[in-house]
Amino acid sequence: MPTATLKIFLVFGDPKRLRTAELSNWTGKAVAGPRSEFEKVLEREETLNPGVYFLTGIDPDTNKSAIYIGEAESIGDRIKSHLSKDFWNNVAFFISKDENLTKAHIRYIEGRLIEIAKSADRSVVMNSQGSGASSVKRKRKP
């Protein structure tokens, strides 16, 4: 495996608070933070971009780890709509720094992530509907 540099920026100097991460030679960027700093997360310009996001916490019915996986053309607008869901206490999302993700890309990524999360069976997957993976097929080389 080739070497890489992972750059983590601690917005407030605390790894448990708002942070961003970038990997060398990768066009993606990750942003994560606790629900208690939701307003600070929304102030980030990255929330205006399309991407995939994760809401994590504890399922109140089973008391087990829970995750909701979603996609949006505007991360900030979409995650605001999840404020009524009580289970989550952390948010993380991934965007493309070169703005090269289309709706089809993020729907496919969301779908694959949901499939992987369900098959791993390490958390309760809180998504109630199917994913976009089945509607976007991978092209296979002949």
Task: Please describe what each predicted stretch is.
Residues N49-P50, I75-P142:
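Structure-specific nucleic-acid interaction/processing domains
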